[in-house]
Design a protein with these regions (language model features):
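C-terminal and inter-domain tail/linker signature
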Residues: 1-119
Length: 119
């Protein structure tokens, strides 16, 4: 079985989201606390992430993602802690939901709302 959170972390670290496409459900939902509208559809979500990664590359930026365990408010749920531009201050926490062995939801959240520990 594919470690879907690990795959997502790898995609962020390599700045390449193409490998993620077959692992997103057809009705995958992408939400962000910084964006008003929710995106729906695996292809739509993947296309958005690919476009975003191209913008990051074009500006010379970088992203680092690390696996964490949430302590609060969702005890023991694993997530990705993302850093953008430096590896000291996290920019967001990424939570996923899995249904039928595919990612059905990606939630981008403010890290200040969580307590976590590195895996």
């Amino acid at each position: 079985m594919v470690d879907l959170l690990g795959l997502l972390i790898e995609c962020y670290n390599k700045n390449d989201f193409s490998p993620l496409r077959p692992h997103l459900s057809d009705n995958c939902r992408y939400t962000s606390q910084w964006v008003f509208d929710e995106m729906i559809g695996g292809n739509t979500v993947c296309d958005y992430l690919i476009a975003k990664s191209k913008r990051i590359s074009a500006t010379g930026g970088f992203v680092v993602a690390k696996r964490v365990s949430i302590l609060s408010p969702y005890p023991e749920q694993e997530a990705a802690l993302m850093f953008q531009g430096n590896e000291e201050t996290p920019s967001c926490i990424i939570l996923i939901k899995i249904e039928s062995k595919k990612i059905s939801q990606i939630d981008i959240c403010m890290p200040q709302l969580f307590k976590y520990r590195y895996k």
